[in-house]
Amino acid sequence: MKRTVGFCILILSVFLIFSCATNNALMKDVYAGYFSIAEEYFKMEKFAKAAEFYEKCLSDNDELTLRNVKYKLAQTYLKLSKWSDASKIYEELLQIDFENTNLKTLLAYSYMKQELFDEAEKIYLSMIESQSLNQSSYKNLILLYGIKNDFEKAETELASYKEKFPLDETIITIETEISNLKKKFEEEQKKAQEEVEKSEDNSEENSESTKNNE
């Protein structure tokens, strides 16, 4: 795979030096070369290098090609945990392809990673409204509520989902996840309360000790 990338770079360099094509045609081939290199790096899971070469393709003025480049670049940003950069691209792509369910799902996911829960919730609710049989949107919404510790909504949506899709056995996984999140949250709350009480007890002891010393 490394040899493939090296070969692509070599061919691209030679092409840049010796090509006699027109400028537009030349740049088309240059961008195609960059894209091929980016794809190879992506396959090798060298996502930082893949992003570098996808970014070089962003000056391509072909609309369809540019859309594909942006989509692959956003995927790479997700791999690099660059949630904000990914969401910006998905927002751009949705302005053109505003009914694309996959783009909406990926945008909502990137919002969740940024803890922009309200924005993600709006997307999931909109998808559920327009596609009432979209099970993934329901389950993602339930998980969203669990992650933001809104367990009342999570459990309400979970019960509603089980009524709508009683034969979906995969919901057990979501149910377990919500249960684990709730348990973790309650344990953290209990620990925090114990710390507060301990701090208050220490404060009272110190205050009493000061009075006695006086």
Feature map (PLM): residue ranges:
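Register position in tetratricopeptide repeats
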Residues: 43-44, 79, 113, 147, ...
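Short coil turns that delineate tetratricopeptide repeat
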Residues: 62-64, 98, 132, 166
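TPR alpha-solenoid repeat register
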Residues: 67-69, 103, 137, 171
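Canonical tetratricopeptide repeat
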Residues: 72, 106, 140, 174-177
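Terminal, low-structured helical/coil segments at or just beyond the last alpha-helical repeat
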Residues: 155-214
